[in-house]
Structures are given as structure tokens and as C-alpha cells.
Amino acid sequence: FYIGGMGAKSTNFHKELFIRMGYEEEANKIQDLFMEGKRDEAARVLPDQLADDMALIGPKDRIRERLQAWRESKVTTMLVATTDKQTLREISELF
């Protein structure tokens, strides 16, 4: 929704962010499909790599391996999305 439908077609912060991340072709296609009312088709354009670039996903060891790059980036806030207490404990150990 954010890439395709937030703001005006010519002014969309989220689309511009994904373009800066190297996903220009996909961002343009997503927005075009979204504007045509083809939301499901637009969602299928999202590459799996984009999710991996945007989030620390996977087992604890994989997150640990990738966390240093995030610490060295411009990221200032991280969100943990889980309701599982054990997962929260494990993630807190990484910090």
C-alpha cells in the first residue's frame, strides 16, 4: 500500500525510499498497478530481497550475523514485532 498509494503519484516518500534502495523498476511497477486498482498484482511485484533488506528476519543466529550491518547504518530505531515472550528474550540478548 505505501509504495503504490501514499501521497500523489509524483510525490510519494515511500516509493522514493525504495527507489533509493535500488528498487526503481519494482517501485514504478507497483505504483502503476496500484493506481490501476490492481492491488493484488502490485503486491506480487515485491521481491523477497526487499523484505530482507528492510528487516532482520529469520532464526536468532541469522539475525545476530546481520545485526552489525544495521548497527553501522543510519537506522536509529528498531521495532520488534512479536508477542512471543521467548522470542522477546532471545532478541533482547542480542542487544
Which residues does each predicted region cover?
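A structural motif corresponding to the C-terminal end of an alpha-helix
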Residues: 69-76
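C-terminal helical cap(s) of enzyme catalytic domains, especially alpha/beta-barrels
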Residues: 84-95
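An alpha-helical appendage that flanks or caps ligand/catalytic pockets
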Residues: 1-69
